[in-house]
Amino acid sequence: MSLPRVGLVVLLLAIATGSLAESANPSAPSRSQSMIDTFQVMCTLELPDFERIAAKATVLRMRPEADSKPSAPGDSGFRSKSWIGNLTTGPFVLLLDETTGPKGKATSCAIVGEVPDLDAFRADAVAAMKLPATPPPEMGNDGSRSFIWDHSFGPGTTLILRDFKPAGKPGIMLKLISAQPLR
């Protein structure tokens, strides 16, 4: 069984197990937990691969939102896709980007959505993904703060948890970037 199929089987089992658990236990997973679970299934079962993640989104019948592949000169290029998904706890957006250049390729997979408590979400994400202590945030000009973990999923990877708490907005983004040098 190929790795993408294994991932889909795991996703379907997680959904089925969750459905069985919900019927036995009326408390559904929290919004934070469902967002973290979705990120782990879509973006971290294997290092981000544009074609495989796009195929997962198609198989899961997620609604395409945007698809762009601007032409670029020479060996460099950029493409991105996004989809809208629905969880029992609310909607989310799946973002997929790939940049190719003379030094290599970087692929990123991200989940974006709203959560009720940004600090609790960050603590839950750190615990669920067994990340080291939360680094100090990098502040953006747009009122965002980004918490960044390098090499958390192996060499050439970066995990970013971004929120807009300083701007008073409830949105979060969990993003895994995998950079691979040219061979």
Task: Label each residue range with its predicted role.
Residues M1-L8:
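Bacterial N-terminal signal peptides that target proteins for export
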Residues S23-V93:
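N-terminal leader/targeting segments
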Residues A16-G18:
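N-terminal signal peptide c-region/cleavage motif recognized by signal peptidases
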Residues P73-T100, W149-K165:
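Amphipathic, interaction-prone secondary-structure segments
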Residues A21-P29, T100-K103, L182-R183:
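Compositionally biased, proline/threonine/alanine/serine-rich low-complexity intrinsically disordered stretches
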Residues K81-S146:
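Long, charged/polar, surface-exposed segments that mediate recognition or autoinhibition
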Residues S144-R183:
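Glycine-rich, aromatic-bearing surface loops/beta-hairpins
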